[in-house]
């Protein structure tokens, strides 16, 4: 009976070397194993069976040690899924970067076009104002030339009038036997002339009171003629002084002229120069502002390009990912 049990136990150990059973037997405490064995079956186990059991148990224990030290192998489908998700994420990020950079580039192009249009409009306005200024200057020169010609013509007329009046200073009345009229003899004539050549009052003292209204009319005509001659001489002297100085406006200016043409030209020139300087300053300020904004946009665009380049450089290739996953396997997430 004991022999049959021993042989049967030996056959079970040899014919069914289950790794789980062997591991459980070797990892279980020794007391339990000894309790299960019968004292009569232990001395009857063959030496060859014990050697086989020991070798098989050592191999199984070595295999179990290897399995416990190394992590479980990863599934190829899980690795491919992870690579696919990583590639999709990086592709979406690159597409976003490219779209953002494209929008920024379009904004920069629009800003540059607006700046070119603004500068072109300003240049056109400056050309128009310069043309208007040239036309105005030509008109002023024509007006000055016409005014000088008028002054020369008036001066010639006044000289001719003064020469003619010098020859006819004395006016004699008609002498006839039938008429008893005669020219009155002016004893004293006192006149006061204002600053502008206007007559204030006349005082006539006649030697004889005979003659009546005719004598009084002749006296008034004589006084008016002398007044006109005095005013004419004063105007000629002032015109000659103005022509001699050149840049000074003539003293006697007609009411319809208003402002001296030289002074008008000087003021117009100063006004145009001031406006042009202000417009140039405004254009320079606008140009500096546009250049600054353009520089900021270009800096931002270059930053986006550098970021995209760095990200594309850091993206590993599929072969590198596969090789690294095979050499350094990592456990699946539970």
Swiss-Prot record:
Start-end of Basic and acidic residues biased regions: 53-63
Keyword terms of this UniProt record: Coiled coil, Cytoplasm
GO cellular component: cell cortex
Coiled coil: 273-300
InterPro entries associated with the record: POLAR-like
Location within or outside the cell: Cytoplasm; Cytoplasm, Cell cortex
Main location: cytoplasm
Region (Disordered): 53-74
Disruption of the gene: reported phenotype: Decreased accumulation of ASK7/BIN2 at the plasma membrane and impaired polarization of ASK7/BIN2 in asymmetric cell division (ACD) precursors thus leading to its nuclear localization in the meristemoids.
GO biological process, one term: asymmetric cell division
Keyword Nucleotidyltransferase attributed: no
Range of residues in the leader sequence: none
Role noted for this protein: Acts as a stomatal lineage scaffold which regulates subcellular localization and transient polarization of kinases (e.g. ASK7/BIN2 and ASK3/SK12) involved in asymmetric cell division (ACD) in a BASL-dependent manner.
Protein name, per record: Protein POLAR-like 1
Organism per entry: Arabidopsis thaliana
Gene name per UniProt: PL1
């Amino acid at each position: 009976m004991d022999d049959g049990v021993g042989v049967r136990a030996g056959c079970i150990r040899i014919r069914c070397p289950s790794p789980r059973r062997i591991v459980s037997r070797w990892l279980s405490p020794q007391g339990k194993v000894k309790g299960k064995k019968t004292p009569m079956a232990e001395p009857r186990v063959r030496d060859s069976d014990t050697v086989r059991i020991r070798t098989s148990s050592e191999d199984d224990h070595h295999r179990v040690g290897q399995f416990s030290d190394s992590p479980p192998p990863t599934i190829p489908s899980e690795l491919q899924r992870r690579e696919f998700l990583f590639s999709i994420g990086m592709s979406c990020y690159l597409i976003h970067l490219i779209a953002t950079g494209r929008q920024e580039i379009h904004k920069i192009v629009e800003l540059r076009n607006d700046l070119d249009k603004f500068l072109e409009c300003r240049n056109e306005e400056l050309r128009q104002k310069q043309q208007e200024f040239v036309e105005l200057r030509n008109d002023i020169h024509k007006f000055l030339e016409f005014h000088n010609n008028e002054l020369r013509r008036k001066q010639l007329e006044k000289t001719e009038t003064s020469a003619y009046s010098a020859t006819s200073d004395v006016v004699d009345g008609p002498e006839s036997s039938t008429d008893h009229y005669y020219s009155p003899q002016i004893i004293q004539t006192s006149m006061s002339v204002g600053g502008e050549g206007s007559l204030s009052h006349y005082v006539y003292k006649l030697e004889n009171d005979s003659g009546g209204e005719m004598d009084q009319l002749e006296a008034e005509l004589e006084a008016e003629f002398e007044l006109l001659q005095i005013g004419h001489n004063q105007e000629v002297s002032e015109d000659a002084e103005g022509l001699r100085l050149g840049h000074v406006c003539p003293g006697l200016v007609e009411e319809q002229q208003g402002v001296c043409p030289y002074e008008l030209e000087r003021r117009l020139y100063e006004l145009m120069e001031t406006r042009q300087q202000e417009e140039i300053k405004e254009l320079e300020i606008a140009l500096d502002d546009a250049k600054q904004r353009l520089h900021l946009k270009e800096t931002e665009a270059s930053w986006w390009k550098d970021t995209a380049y760095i990200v594309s450089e850091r993206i590993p290739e599929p072969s590198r990912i596969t090789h690294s996953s095979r050499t350094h396997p990592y456990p699946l997430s539970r």
